[in-house]
Structure formats: C-alpha cells, structure tokens
C-alpha cells in the first residue's frame, strides 16, 4: 500500500490560488472568501480566468482550455501553497484528462 503524502501546513504569507474550474463566479460573492484568506495571513492570487465568462450551453468561467490552464498553473506553480476553487461542479470532469501532475506529485498542495 502506498503511503499517503499530505501537503505541508500553511503558514502566514503563503499564496493561495483562487481558480474557477467550472461555472463562472462574480467577484462580489468572492469578497468574503478573500477577506477570510487575508485575515489568516495568506495571500490570495487569482488565476488568469478566475473571473472570466464563457457560454457554451452552460456558463463557464472560460473555455475548457482556459480553465485547464488555470488549474495546471495552480497545481504546478512553486509559489502556490494551496488551491481554492471558487466553485466546482459541472465542467470539472472535462478537465481531468488534461491535468499535468508531475510537480504536484513532488510538492502536493491543499485543494479547497
């Protein structure tokens, strides 16, 4: 059986990536999340398409390519210590086949 590897504990000053891997989200409802993150001493960092809008029968935060770019950026960026999905749900399953997990396996992160 493989050993479970947990991410390191977060410390003040760590960066938390805010991404939207599924539906779009407005900035105003995210404000309480940003306030919470900042109040704990962490630095929220938005993905390039976190507040994007793309409609294709469903209101996504971006095209599939844009959403996977944000997710892979957050997973593989050494400066990011945790990932906070602004919302999840429908649309996320389309991204799984595009995940690039090489760095993530070496340095796992909390996914919230």
Where are each of the predicted segments found?
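Short, glycine/charged-enriched secondary-structure capping and boundary segments
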Residues: 31-33, 97-101
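ATP/NTP phosphate-donor binding region
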Residues: 1-79
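General beta-strand structural signal in soluble alpha/beta enzymes
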Residues: 44-48, 84-86, 111-112
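Short, acidic/small-residue loops that bind anionic groups at enzyme active sites
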Residues: 99-112
